[in-house]
Amino acid sequence: MKKILFSAIVALFAVSAVSAQDKGNWAVGPRMNLYTNTGDAVVGLGVFGRYSISDTWRIEPSLTALLHSGCSIDLSVDAHYIFHVAPYWSVYPAVGFTANDIGIWAAGLNIGGGFDLKLTSDWDLTAGLKWQPMFDDWRKNPVVISVGAAYRF
């Protein structure tokens, strides 16, 4: 399990991430997640990266440390389809995969969406909501609320 976890972390930082603006742009940033529908709410602090494949498509790998006893991390990779509502505002639906150990290790899907608000030429405020239906029968499917900042370069 440690080798798989280490490989996933290396892949996360090797691939990095996407920006909501133009093809080839990168963005990285901190994020705080709140995992609901887990019995007790679980808070997570982490990092994400974004890479714009085109003006409308980007990928976003993320790594989140879960701050709850008996939990450790959440690894996710999502694809976003960007709708540029205004020069400073964009919204996106998202779909992807996740693996985490809220109670026990399990893998699942990410289904949701979010928005980016351009604060400066390099910084965005980002927020999202996603449902994580897991591929096991034992635990509930978390709903994740996230808030973060993205530095674009």
Label every PLM stretch briefly.
Residues 26, 55-61, 87-91, 117-125:
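Repeated loop/turn-to-beta-strand initiation elements of outer-membrane beta-barrel proteins
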Residues 77, 94-97, 109-115, 129-131:
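Hydrophobic alpha-helical segments of small multi-pass membrane proteins
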Residues 50-52, 80-84, 116-118, 150-152:
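Structural signature of outer-membrane beta-barrel channels/translocons
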